[in-house]
């Protein structure tokens, strides 16, 4: 287990910066793009919240949920319909945009409309996909597979940087623990930073997912999102990934682990307070 790499750099997605010693930034949005109107509604609300809190925010949503538990699960708007919406969110709202890619052939086209290409956890070792994403020059956010140790991600990141792209983020989203269960080992956060040399993101919503736990869909325990998010920020991360939705109980995917949009601002405000304390050079002792 090699843990000797250079200090984590700062990676910028548009105007939003991610760094282990920089103020916390957020990646947030609904699980999948349900419609143009829905995406713009949520993105607009998140932009207003980010402005009030003075925090960097990257908007995320998926054009295709290609790994749904069941073939009957809704997958999203689709690539061709989603691309102009991604571009519109970036141009009209000024938010950097993140979406995931599943095939190497998608990367060039998607990169024309977004700022960050995300590699899903299940695909994090697919070399051709990683190299295609790297070749776009966009920021690449690669999620740690639920089946990998944190130090295994050094080889994953090396594929991207070896492809000539230093702009890499690494996301922790839990580790498989028995059937239909994930656990979050907070030790993985500093290990990821140390072994990959990349800014580390904590995915607070997928970490409480129960994969396949509802038979034809995944379950989740959204009540633990704030708990794990606070723990991760206290340990020290560059950013937190939070899926949010105006009505998660009726969302087409990942509803059980998404944060209701009405609760998002209070959660992020609390995380910012934890982040300020965790990154303070000399925290004042309580009087």
UniProtKB/Swiss-Prot annotation:
Pfam families: DAHP_synth_1. InterPro entries: Aldolase_TIM (IPR013785), DAHP1/KDSA (IPR006218), KDO8P_synthase (IPR006269). Pathway: Carbohydrate biosynthesis; 3-deoxy-D-manno-octulosonate biosynthesis; 3-deoxy-D-manno-octulosonate from D-ribulose 5-phosphate: step 2/3; Bacterial outer membrane biogenesis; lipopolysaccharide biosynthesis. NCBIfam families: KDO8P_synth, PRK05198.1. HAMAP family: KDO8P_synth. Belongs to the KdsA family. This is 2-dehydro-3-deoxyphosphooctonate aldolase. The lineage of its organism: Bacteria, Pseudomonadati, Pseudomonadota, Alphaproteobacteria, Hyphomicrobiales.
């Amino acid at each position: 287990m090699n843990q000797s790499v250079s200090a984590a750099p700062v990676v910028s997605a548009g105007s939003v910066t991610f760094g282990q010693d920089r103020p916390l930034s957020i990646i947030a949005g609904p699980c999948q793009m349900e419609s143009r109107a829905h995406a713009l509604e949520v993105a607009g609300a998140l932009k207003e919240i980010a402005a009030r809190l003075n925090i960097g925010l990257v908007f995320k949503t998926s054009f295709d949920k290609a790994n749904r538990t069941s073939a009957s699960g809704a997958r999203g708007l689709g690539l061709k319909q989603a691309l102009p919406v991604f571009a519109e969110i970036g141009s009209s709202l000024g938010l950097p945009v993140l979406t995931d890619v599943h095939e190497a052939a998608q990367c060039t086209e998607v990169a024309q409309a977004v700022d960050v290409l995300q590699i899903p956890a299940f695909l994090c070792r697919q070399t051709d996909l990683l190299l295609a994403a790297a070749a776009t020059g966009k920021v690449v956010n690669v999620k740690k597979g639920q089946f990998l140790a944190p130090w295994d991600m050094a080889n994953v990141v090396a594929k991207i940087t070896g492809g000539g792209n230093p702009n890499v983020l690494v996301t922790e989203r839990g580790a498989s623990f028995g059937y239909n269960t994930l656990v979050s080992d907070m030790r993985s956060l500093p290990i990821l930073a140390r072994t990959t040399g990349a800014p580390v993101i904590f995915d607070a919503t997928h970490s409480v997912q129960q994969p396949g736990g509802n038979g034809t869909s995944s379950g989740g325990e959204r009540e633990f999102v704030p708990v794990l998010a606070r723990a991760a920020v206290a340990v020290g991360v560059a950013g937190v990934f939070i899926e949010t939705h105006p009505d998660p109980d009726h969302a087409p995917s990942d509803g059980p682990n998404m944060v209701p949009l009405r609760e998002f601002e209070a959660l992020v405000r609390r995380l910012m307070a934890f982040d300020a304390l965790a990154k303070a050079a000399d925290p004042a002792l309580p009087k």
